[in-house]
Each structure stands twice: as structure tokens, then as C-alpha cells.
Amino acid sequence: MQFATVQPVTARSDLPVITDEEAAALARTTVNLFRAWELTDAEARTLLGDMAQRTWARWKTGNIGRIDRDLRARMAILMGIHKALRYLFTDPARGYAWIRRPNAAFAGRSALDVMLRGEITDLIDLRAYLDAERGAW
């Protein structure tokens, strides 16, 4: 039996990096988006990767601390979802309400139900669905 030779993969330096300032702005915008979506604190914390209750309470008062890479990615995906909804619905209120409506594409569940499964891949899948719906392929 022979093992395959594996070539090391180097990290790509050309990918965009979310700076600390951008992450703080994303956090403030995420708080506002969650207000528009009328999320409960528990729902908001789940979408943010099971954020601690105390941390979420601080965020709501504008006290944003250190934001790790996973959380930055989650917030960026959530902003992509919001942007896609704004493209699909000219009336922002319709887009905000859409996330709670049952959807045949999600076996009768809402987009929020899909996102509340809690995995970052659930957010990615919803973003991909919305991009396909708006014809961004």
C-alpha cells in the first residue's frame, strides 16, 4: 500500500480581510437588521453562533468587543442575505417579513427556521438560494 503525496496548501493572501473597524460597523448594522427582522434575543444569539447573552446585551447598547473570524463571516453572510432581499423586494418591509413566512423551497419552513438551525452553512445555503432567485449566477 502506498500513501499519496500531499502538497501543502498556502493561505491565500489576496482574499479580502474584514478589518476591526469594518467588523464593528458590521456588528452595529447587524443589531439594526435584527431589530428590523424583529428577532428575539435568543434568535439573534443563535444566528450569531450562539453568542453569550451578556455579549449580545452589550452589543445592543453599542459596546462591541473583539469579533472573531467566524462571527465576522456570519455577519457578512447575513448582510448578503439582507442585500439579496432588498434586490428581490422593493418594499423593505416585505423583505423583512419574508424571512418568517413559510416557503415551499424550505419544505414549508421559513427562512428564519432554516437559519436558526445554527450552522454557518445554513446561512450560506440561504444566501445561495436568494442569489439564485435574483438571478445572480
What positions do the PLM features span?
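Non-transmembrane "mature" sequence context
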Residues: 1-137
